[in-house]
Amino acid sequence: MFSTLNARLADVGVETATIGFFSWLGITYSIKVFWAPVVDRLKLPFLDRLLGKRRSWILLAQAGIATGLYLMAHVDATVAPEMMAFCGLLVAFSSATQDVAIDAYRIEVAEERLQAALAATYIFGYRLALLVAGAGALYLAEFWSWQVSYEVMALLVGVGMVTV
């Protein structure tokens, strides 16, 4: 999301200094350690009973990502850069939270001998998603629009939600 967001902001004429400010959204992955204990200990009402603690956090995080991306599709960054930043923060925070929950889920459900293979599979999926969200989003934006691009990315996250 971050590389395509920079391209989108530049494409619509947002000032370079403002685009630089948006790079702070990436810090969420570095500071996820501060809310990881909450994800580790807090059971989400209703969802926990249906899916269990880890899967409920994964689903909530994916809902946050999809919502943030969908909202970003409909925000004009030249008119409301603060709203775009809020949506970006929602995506970044939700993405980092998903990372915490998926790691915890992987550790709990698999035997120790399978951990390396599962971690590698997760990283492969993450890298594939980066490619789709990067090159795929840029391709869609070039041939259709940024709005369509972000809506499709939100829809793809929705597909992932079905697998939880």
Placement of each model-derived feature along the sequence:
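Transmembrane alpha-helix termini and helix-breaking/packing motifs in multi-pass membrane transporters
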Residues: 40-43, 47, 70-74, 131-151
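C-terminal ends and interior cores of transmembrane alpha-helices
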Residues: 44-45, 56-79
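Glycine-rich segments within core transmembrane alpha-helices of 12-TM secondary carriers
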Residues: 28-35, 116-141
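Symmetry-related core transmembrane helices of the 12-TM Major Facilitator Superfamily/SLC fold
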Residues: 59-66, 148-164
